């Protein structure tokens, strides 16, 4: 089952190896959903603050384990965040199964959808440089679509986009939620968290917890955007060139 899933994860993870030597200078998030068929799906993901792994997500449907590896949220707050992530995963799977029932002749398994997003602050000596923010989506290991934060526009990951990619881009670029809210999350929420974390990284207490809580809520918003990407994929031959 995982012969295609795990190699893809390993291909995406080196992005974290490019994090700046200062562990607080970048935040990377990764989610991968592997659909063996209409009944079996396995999720895996993580969040890293520089070289520090902060969150992990792994497991088959109905038994996904989500962990925060750093004590930035109190138990009650983390329980709400974890519940939100579990709800998202359930809705994501339901969406795929719904489209499969409606377009069964166009859906081909296995299928792997991966999402990588985050932000990086420039080195201090790079005067005038702006933070680097990104949101990239791949299907079966190939670049599918990516987000241009400056213009809040989604673009194809290929010079010759398929009909599936064009359909997906049309959907993602049609709504404020998938454009300007994402732009705000990447350019403001994510970057401000890193800047605040650098200022308070030697301090312990609720300040960091509150900051990270708002970031996790932003991650949830990003996760729902992945569901929008899935709609485009499954509505047009499941990501195959068409």
Curated annotation (Swiss-Prot):
The lineage of its organism: Eukaryota, Metazoa, Chordata, Craniata, Vertebrata. It holds the Pfam family MHC_I_3. Expressed in endothelial cells. Residues 18-214 are extracellular. GO terms for molecular function: signaling receptor activity. Residues 236-242 are cytoplasmic. This is Endothelial protein C receptor. Residues 1-17 form the signal peptide. Disulfide bonds join 119-190, 223-236. SUPFAM superfamilies: MHC antigen-recognition domain. Glycans are attached at residues 46, 63, 140, 166, 176. Binds activated protein C. Enhances protein C activation by the thrombin-thrombomodulin complex; plays a role in the protein C pathway controlling blood coagulation. It comes from Mus musculus. Keywords: Blood coagulation, Disulfide bond, Glycoprotein, Hemostasis, Membrane, Receptor, Signal, Transmembrane, Transmembrane helix. It is found in: Membrane. It is a single-pass type I membrane protein. InterPro entries: Endothetial_C_recpt, MHC_I-like_Ag-recog, MHC_I-like_Ag-recog_sf, MHC_I/II-like_Ag-recog.
